[in-house]
């Protein structure tokens, strides 16, 4: 496997909370996929702070993923097309759907994700990998001399 791209993102949890409050909850429905939304509602029902932290980490993971694949938030990368879920062990993993899944499969791209949060911030890091050579990837690192 070769690294296709990397992405990282950090978000202030209070900003996510403010947007969620301002939109009456619609922000979560816009950003989260169906499985993420179920987890969000369950966590938020137990603890408002944990629900908001979950939303913030998933928002951050989508931003980091969009950077790792080089698209930013442009089609076929959409908020709901990528979900970050957790294995029973707690390990996070990403699941793509629809046209994004097709786009990734055509390029042989898989990804690894990690997320973390504290009271004020949520952060994520994504490594996108491929078994196929990237069409515009350099073959070597160039070095300039003074």
UniProtKB/Swiss-Prot annotation:
Catalytic reaction annotation: apo-[ACP] + CoA = holo-[ACP] + adenosine 3',5'-bisphosphate + H(+)
Subcellular location: Cytoplasm
InterPro entries referenced in this protein's UniProt entry, alphabetically: 4-PPantetheinyl_Trfase_dom, 4-PPantetheinyl_Trfase_dom_sf, ACPS, Ppantetheine-prot_Trfase_dom
Gene3D superfamilies tied to this protein: 4'-phosphopantetheinyl transferase domain (3.90.470.20)
Cofactors (names): Mg(2+)
Main location: cytoplasm
Catalytic class of the enzyme: transferase
GO molecular function terms listed in the Swiss-Prot or TrEMBL record: holo-[acyl-carrier-protein] synthase activity; magnesium ion binding
Enzyme Commission number: 2.7.8.7
Keyword Cell membrane in record: no
Binding residues annotated for Mg(2+), in chain numbering: 9, 63
A single Gene Ontology CC term: cytoplasm
Protein name: Holo-[acyl-carrier-protein] synthase
Organism per entry: Burkholderia multivorans (strain ATCC 17616 / 249)
Native organism taxonomy: Bacteria, Pseudomonadati, Pseudomonadota, Betaproteobacteria, Burkholderiales
